[in-house]
Amino acid sequence: MRVRASVLDLGKKLPKRGDPNNAEFTDDAKTDAADDGLVVLASYGTTPKGRGPRGTAEIEDLVLDVGDDYLRHPALNAAGLSGTEWLALFRANIAVESAFNPDARSSVGAIGLGQLMPGTADLLGVDPHDPEDNLHGSARYLLAQLEDFGAADLALAAYNAGPEAVRDYGGIPPYAETEGHVAKVLRLTNATLSSE
């Protein structure tokens, strides 16, 4: 089943859970998207060495399982996102952050699937080196930004550049990395939600 929606339509009234027009992110939908090449990103030849799942498909399943744990989070209502949109957004953020590589490390020290900074991981009470823990921290941090800013683009900017930067600029900061991050995540989210 395909979903026609855009996280850019945040003010639009969305169908409720159980409505036949609101496709759940089922195994069939995941398979369809994977068949279309919309949700498969390579880890560029790296072999995950961390604890937990080893392959990209297993990591993607873990991403969706963790995302499922937060389907009833109040931040989704605050940002006007359905569960399907949340799962697509969360998955896309992880894809862009780490290409599903649990051992990814940035030049500034961000760690793992969600590219959590050590201080952020400490505040969230998660082990950034553990794939599942890292994903829970990433989900909670992204949800906090959705709750604070009420929009997917601003939440992604805050996830990438920090909430202070978004507040200081009154929107997406004019940093090339942050603007690129937001654009890539939203593009992948919308590709996942759209049929081709």
Show which residues each predicted segment covers.
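Glycine-rich, acidic and aromatic/proline-enriched surface loops and short helix-turn segments
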Residues: 92-99, 119, 161
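Alpha-helical scaffolds flanking conserved acidic
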Residues: 83-92, 111, 152-157
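Catalytic and substrate-binding regions of cell-wall glycan-acting enzymes that process beta-1,4-linked
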Residues: 137, 157-196
